[in-house]
Amino acid sequence: MKQLIITADDFGLSSGVNAAVEQGWRDGILTCASIMPGATAFDQALTIARRNPGLQVGLHLTLVQGKAVLPSSQIPDLVNEAGEFSNNPVACGMRYFFDKGLYKQLKQEIEAQIQRVVDSGIPLSHIDGHLNIHLHPTVFAFLTELMPRYGITSFRLSRERLCHNLRFDRERRAGKTIERIIFGALANHARPILKELGIRYAGEVKGVLNSGRMTEGYILQIIEGLSDGLTELYFHPGILPDTEITRRMPDYRHADELAAIISPRIKQRVAELNIGLENYRGDRKEYA
């Protein structure tokens, strides 16, 4: 049996993202959304989540290219005076690994992001990360301590088959190869620890190598070759015009990704292939 988790990232980033998430849940195959607690439209995202209780919400942990939850005075080595993390993921990754002086502030911010969602009353069941920062070895070590404490039972294990991806999209071959090596190694490190903790994860995650380009045509191709078991597809849907979306991700095809989520062709093909739609809790979504 094949099952699909369909997730929208960046929930709370902007009104355009939030509107797309709600439309994807109501009219499409979306089953989950990953929320950014420090983002400007976080409160609006909570309102949408409350009026759509079947939509499962996870934490989109943000430690790069975004805003912190804690005040800058409390984590001055992580953010600038405006409370913003660096926009350079490589520099962040190196600092978070080698600079042990950051560890206390880093753990405080990670827990604060979890706590902000928990305090909202929205059930929080899974964790992923902006630019997959949740797999960073230092960050992951803190998460393995915090997830059991907060009852978080699922985790995005960001690994994707390179050969399957390149069969349908041969752009960025060098970049995808590097990403596959890096995230593959990080996933291999995390997997046995997640197993030991009893944390659920999908066998494969689609969206790692085609982030921002999860279009209808691409999705129709890749669902034909899904592995048995649980697969997650993650998207970055948005409704334009939206200055926050285009400022942060000018090359992402947000409208096309929303179109894929609500595509009647994709919904029909998923049903024909007898692929189940569910969230990380295992709740099934019925075909409309």
Task: List where the protein language model places each region.
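DG-centered beta-turn motif at the end of beta-strands
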Residues: 8-11
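Terminal accessory/targeting
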Residues: 2-5, 15-126, 137-288
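Conserved strand-turn element in the central/C-terminal portion of the radical SAM core barrel
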Residues: 129
